[in-house]
Amino acid sequence: MSKSKAIENNGISNTNSPNGKYMAPRPEGVKPTCVVITYSVSKDIKAVREVLDERGASVHYIIDKDGTQKEYHNDLTDQAFYAGKSSWKGEVGVNKFGIGVMLINDAKSDFPAEQIGKLKEFLKDVTERYPNLDLKHDLVGLGEVTVNREGNAHIAPGSKFPWKELAEAGFGRYFETTQEQKSKLLLSLDSTGEKVNTLQENLKEYGYGVESTSTFDQFTQQAVRVFNDRYGTGLPNEEPPVSWTEAGQDVLSQLLGQTVLEQTENA
């Protein structure tokens, strides 16, 4: 089985990489509109390349723990195969319009400063090459675009990923919440009715692929989990963090430009 050959480009992306086996052209007229972050689970680039090839999967870029960046596909013309069944902001099939970036990480450890520093450089480069790509609003985790997937859902890039640090650098958004807010439970697995329906509508408005069912179903749980991981809004000591708290509601309200707690209080 042939392997994709990477270009080592000193950590800054370009659009001259050779096409590997596991890719397809982007649809005509489609340009990247989001960047999707995932992690490898595998310990190094060699191991992750073997896993990707076995699965017929691919990403545009891989960033190693020491900050080394390798490019595998042209992010302007090629769709890599990393998202599968996915959606973002109502658009189905994220591979068609996303740029996939994988960080070497075992899903349990902190991300090294060198790696995150290189990611920031990469994201800055992307914004310069694609001025219409809004990475304050359209930088997402793989888990966020695959919440509507059956079975074992993705949670990448996980709770260790430093979303706050990236937001401080201008990539993504982050809002501080208090321990008191995190400890106040609003909705949980056995919740039903209008409050759940309103939460589902708001998560969908934010961009997640959930539907309004008025029950705290599997896809709502997955959406709440990755939201809590990203914004640090989960119920203290709950693992996985699938309950909805006042902290989560506060952040979601700010993300949507709404009054804090307006939805659940009026439901």
Swiss-Prot record:
**Entry-linked InterPro entries:** Amidase/PGRP_sf, Amidase_domain, NAMLAA_amidase_2, Peptidoglycan-bd-like, PGBD-like_sf, PGBDSf
Keyword field contains Cell membrane: no
Q: What is its main location?
A: secreted
- Please state where this protein is localized: Secreted
Task: Keywords in alphabetical order, please.
Answer: Cell wall biogenesis/degradation, Hydrolase, Secreted
Q: Where in the numbering of this chain does the N-acetylmuramoyl-L-alanine amidase domain appear?
A: 33-141
Per its record, the protein catalyses:
Hydrolyzes the link between N-acetylmuramoyl residues and L-amino acid residues in certain cell-wall glycopeptides
Q: Short name of one Pfam family for this protein?
A: Amidase_2
| UniProt EC number | 3.5.1.28
Q: Disordered: where is this region?
A: 1-25
Q: Which GO terms describe its molecular function?
A: N-acetylmuramoyl-L-alanine amidase activity
Q: Where is the composition biased (Polar residues)?
A: 10-19
Question: Alphabetically, which GO biological process terms does the record hold?
Answer: cell wall organization; peptidoglycan catabolic process; peptidoglycan turnover
Q: Name one GO cellular component term.
A: extracellular region
* Similarity field: Belongs to the N-acetylmuramoyl-L-alanine amidase 2 family.
Cross-referenced PANTHER family: N-ACETYLMURAMOYL-L-ALANINE AMIDASE AMID
Record's protein name: Putative N-acetylmuramoyl-L-alanine amidase RC0497
